[in-house]
């Protein structure tokens, strides 16, 4: 969240934020894990058995469309996706990709307190210096 807020404040280019919140129909319901969104961004959900579920076709369409449009134009908006505005200072817009898709403003204000309540805090083993930028150090670790 801090990284997105920093990039939005600098405004060198539009900043878009998303949250993949699909619950997979496996092992009684598994929350999305790291990289579980990749098949949908590449329109390959049908090739990954765990992705075969009700929202799969819709996610293939909108997530791959958003990915291609962002790569082509810098703007992820595409047919089938609600209007997705870029983040700006004080307004962090998050597109939720899941059974339904919705653009939420400042969702982190609702979500982060819940995460902090139920998950122990994470301290990176070697935090980046305060003045570290994205091109050096470990600023990419989040």
Regions inferred by a protein language model and the residue ranges of each:
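C-terminal helix-and-tail extensions that cap enzymatic domains
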Residues: 1-142
């Amino acid at each position: 969240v801090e990284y997105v807020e920093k990039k939005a404040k600098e405004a060198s280019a539009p900043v878009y934020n998303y949250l993949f919140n699909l619950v997979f129909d496996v092992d009684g319901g598994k929350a999305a894990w790291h990289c579980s969104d990749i098949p949908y961004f590449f329109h390959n959900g049908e090739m990954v058995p765990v992705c075969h579920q009700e929202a799969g076709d819709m996610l293939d369409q909108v997530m791959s469309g958003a990915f291609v449009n962002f790569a082509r134009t810098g703007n992820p908006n595409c047919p089938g996706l609600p209007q997705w505005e870029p983040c700006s200072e004080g307004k962090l817009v998050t597109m939720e990709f899941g059974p339904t898709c919705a653009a939420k403003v400042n969702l982190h204000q609702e979500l982060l307190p819940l995460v902090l309540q139920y998950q122990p805090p994470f301290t990176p083993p070697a935090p980046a210096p305060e003045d570290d930028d994205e091109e050096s150090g470990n600023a990419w670790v989040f």
